[in-house]
Amino acid sequence: MIPALKIRQPIEPWEKFLTDSITTPEELSLLTETEESDIHKVISEYPMFINPYFLGLIKEKGDAIYRQAVPDIREISKLEGFVDPLNEEGLSPVQGLTHKYPDRVLFLVSGRCAMYCRFCNRKRKVGRASMVTRETIREGLSYIKSTKDIRDVLLSGGDPLLLSDKELFKILSELRSISHVETIRIGTRIPCSLPHRVTKQLAGMLKGFHPLYINTHFNHPAEITPQAASACSLLAEAGIPLGCQTVLLKGVNDDGMLIKELMLKLLAIRVRPYYLFQADLARGTSHFWTALKKGLGIMAELQGNISGLGIPRFMIDLPEGGGKIPITPEYIRGIKGDELVVKNYLGDEYRYPIIDHGDQKGYTGHKAEYK
């Protein structure tokens, strides 16, 4: 009897980008022997993976896209920071799930990314086969089912959108069957790093799981291409609210005018700027860290110079699992009597009444007479 042949399903076009991704320095052009040697040293600890689409966004060696994707010897020569900067492992009741806040969890459902970001706060996990398994997903779902306080689940990884439609459908269906889970969020860089993955079929499938929110991750205006815009359009047309979590990175986007351009371009493709993160204190990423005053200065530049829709919240994710906190430019100068003294985006001081409106004292906000 002739055994039946196992018929392999044809790969999707977007999967070809993954199979053609580069993982060694020899596949990069314009590198010196020293640079190739340095990259080999780095990838022995922190792997490299760059798909052809994202590689094509690099215009010259050392530009903003290059810095995000190509390994740098400083990843292993500068050892500041934490291996697990947010204490995700310490706050993990089961492998692959972090329960930091009372009503929500971070659930890792994929160990794959379309490219390995050199500033990743999960560098300790990237490229490891054990990062996510069927067993960790099963245990995560079981924990969510048994923990009634959980109303919000954030899917992350790796990148959840690199699961097949079938795999993602199964996980989302399981979550939607849990009565106390109200909101599902997906954290993904796919609209930026491999927008071809966002197909009509994927968007149509996701549409069936509302309320579903997606936060994506663009760091530079050069990442907003026609392909990225098309991917975001498909998701938006499926009724999925889109936000963006940008990371402030030295040598990539630590400039107020550039961040303003990025925020405006995000709005144009129907993505709401959500967070601007101070880079996490992950080991191997210190060459990307910016001074806190840099981020505060950028936020001050945005205020009054761009619509409120385009202003993200400047956030720090505290080390050791302290959680996210907003950091804002200081607009309050003090209190004079019954008035709050503040400055506007131009630096002019104003007074604003701090009494109850029902006091009927006739107070109105006005420009301060002093500077």
Kindly give the residue locations of the regions a language model identified.
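Flexible, acidic/Gly-rich N-terminal and inter-domain linker regions that tether
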Residues: 1-100
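Flexible, glycine/proline-enriched loop segments at strand-loop-helix junctions
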Residues: 38-39, 125-131, 158-159, 189
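Conserved, mostly hydrophobic/aromatic
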Residues: 54, 117, 274
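Short, charged beta->alpha transition segments
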Residues: 92-95, 104-108, 138-145
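Canonical Radical SAM [4Fe-4S] cluster-binding loop centered on the CxxxCxxC motif
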Residues: 99-134, 186
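Mobile, glycine- and charge-enriched loop segments
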Residues: 119-120, 148, 229-254, 339, ...
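Conserved AdoMet/S-adenosylmethionine-binding subsite of the radical SAM
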Residues: 138-145, 149-150, 161-306
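C-terminal accessory regions of radical SAM enzymes
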Residues: 299-371
